[in-house]
Amino acid sequence: MYLYIETLKQRLDAINQLRVDRALAAMGPTFQKVYSLLPTLLHCHHPLMPGYLDGNVPHGVCLFTPNETQQDYLSEVEAKWGEPLQQSVGGELPITGVYSMGSTSSIGQCHTSDLDVWVCHQAWLDSEERNRLQEKCSLLEKWAASMGVEVSFFLIDENRFRHNASGSLGGEDCGSTQHILLLDEFYRSAVRLAGKRILWNMVPVEEENNYDDYVLSLYAQGVLTPNEWLDLGGLSTLSAEEYFGASLWQLYKSIDSPYKAVLKTLLLEAYSWEYPNSQLLAMEIKQRLHAGEIVAFGLDAYCMMLDRVTRYLTQINDTTRLNLVRRCFYLKVCEKLSRSPASVGWRREILSQLVSEWGWSDESLAVLDNRANWKIERVREAHNELLDAMMQSYRNLIRFARRNNLSVSASPQDIGVLTRKLYAAFEALPGKVTLVNPQISPDLSEEHLTFIHVPAGRANRAGWYLYNQAPSMDAIVSHQPLEYNRYLNKLVSWAYFNGLLTSKTRLHIKSANLCDTVKLQELVTDISHHFPLRLPAPTPKALYSPCEIRHLAIIVNLEHDPTAAFRNQVVHFDFRKLDVFSFGEQQQCLVGSIDLLYRNSWNEVRTLHFSGEQAVLEALKTILGKMHQDAAPPESVDVFCYSQHLRGLIRTRIQQLVSECIELRLSSTRQEPGRFKAVRVSGHTWGLFFERLSVSVQKLENAVEFYGAISNNKLHGLSIQVETDQIHLPPVVDGFASEGIIQFFFEGTADEKGFNIYILDESNRVEVYHHCEGSKEALVRDVSRFYSSSHDRFTYGSSFINFNLPQFYQIVQLDGRTQVIPFRSNTLSHLYIVDREPSQPAQQFQLH
């Protein structure tokens, strides 16, 4: 037994040294310095060293002995300090060991790879000590970043995996969805930089189920010494729930980095396909280690992963995804085999051997090696391949869940975050800008972009077509359009957010007076100034909350501009009564089209289009409908107006209206429920009613319609609209009826559980509401606000004789007689009257 254990230790040490050498071999001197010094900086704590902070900070790595590079560094520090450094020696120090894991040291490591480091610490550290150690690690991350090396430290309690503890989706340790699988990746890829050897490697595969007993027997026999080994526990049997959760997590990661994540996603799919007889990859590597089978180029973790996935996809006869995963693997290695190397390293030798086995052509290699220059056509093709592969994995995952009748162990919050990010990235919706370049190619910019409009009635669909060519007939005819949409805003947004359209792109446009190059360039400039391309990924909190509009642009008269007809015409209007929604004698709405462009809290980019006289109202209702009552206000709301005339007035009026409506929407029911806003468009008055769950729009052609709208939003009762000769009103109401003013009469019911309302408009038309249960004060307040808020709110053809504020009365019993008294409410004290200016003749202006 002793000889067997010693042989295993020698193999482990040899493979570990091979991995250290490989981790350093392909990297530059800066990475080599950081990688080599990290153990030293965790072992020592000194003001002249990176990572230093005042106070009691746990430091010291068990069994640490500096190598030549590390000793030279320590000697330099001592020379600067002027005296020897105090170093922790012997005993059980706070840090059990320091280990890199993941792609580091494997064939998957390249010059852009980051570095994941596990700092395993003793279980006896208290929370304050752990926090201090975390602060030290954060300072070391910043030090490495200042040198151009991305390092992420993960503090691992040595008992963490025994207690089934987990992190959350906020960090790279992948939340509650992975536990054993995280340990699986660590065991198969860990490189010991300093500290104790990993005990798990010493336990034969056949003893895995008796892991703890076997370890105790080794200690009891004196074959192993307990304080020389890091023991994170065995790899117990995986549940179907854990496979499901981990696979969702990998799909989540694949959204932002698809090439990097496809291989791991398919490994998990292979695991679930073999379930319940799955053998984790770490177990396979350990089995070969114990048997002395140092295959796969030194038990390289990435090569072993590719081998397992290849076996799985071959068994299910999925050649499409097998070819894709090989391409992903090739690109991950970052060795361009079609080009002559400066030197031939071990990665290139391995990759050349694999490519030869796959039978790839020189042309295929050249295409992959030219990835940095891929443009939109090739990137979209690659994106679709990756999307198809991920969706196939997702479908297989759902089948797996159904087959095993899963109750998913991932926390419901994590599952919500994962599925929402998948939805936000992959769900194709009308108006949504699909982002097709998640780290596939670094530059999709185009030298020329041409937007061509096809009117209705032609052979092609009416709408806009985008080409990445200058607008010559030969170029356009011989090329397929990159993208089509009915509306220009969607095409411009798609080109901008996918990186085709940059400040250096030359723009061309062909349309029949809908839009010209100047207007197009203005739109591009406005979008680029207000919508940054790069934003932080949405937080888990944002993903498990309802999506909210973050940045909103309201694009006015881009495609249809009513003011264009004013050119060289004499237009009659009065500047003091200028209303861009009901302009001039014809009461024309000067907004012909509105496009919305917004980015939400899930980082989705959406566009919408509205045209015609109702564009303003439809756009308003849509914007407000996307804001739930408790949403945060948008971070920015910008109005881009492209009218030929009165541009500033139109922009200002829309900005004012939208801001006011957003304020009403987000403040309704917090203070004053059921608020509304009257808007006059094309000579008609419309009411926007702000309720708890929605915003409704109703036309208010006359007073009775308005009261009906108010009452339906405010009161619960039976509404009957009648004429005075069809019903006998209470005599006291008949006696009070007066033409030219609007009157409300409130009457209590016999059971005292509600009230009736009699409404008489200016022409004494009547509307009656029986058994109302709402608030009289709220109704009075809203009606009063409506009538004190704007001029000329109904059509000129309505039969108003006077425009007095409504009168409110209460029907009461006094001294045995039915009487009418004024309705008393604090609300009435807040009313204000807008004095109308004396009428002035309209002035004439000629617009050019």
Curated annotation (Swiss-Prot):
It is found in: Cytoplasm. The regulatory domain is involved in the regulation of cyclase activity by the carbon source. Keywords: ATP-binding, cAMP biosynthesis, Cytoplasm, Lyase, Nucleotide-binding. Transmembrane segments: none annotated. GO terms for molecular function: adenylate cyclase activity; ATP binding. It catalyses: ATP = 3',5'-cyclic AMP + diphosphate. It comes from the Bacteria. GO terms for biological process: cAMP biosynthetic process. Residues 1-535 are annotated as: Catalytic. Its EC number is 4.6.1.1. GO terms for cellular component: cytoplasm. Residues 541-848 are annotated as: Regulatory. Belongs to the adenylyl cyclase class-1 family. This is Adenylate cyclase. It comes from Yersinia intermedia.
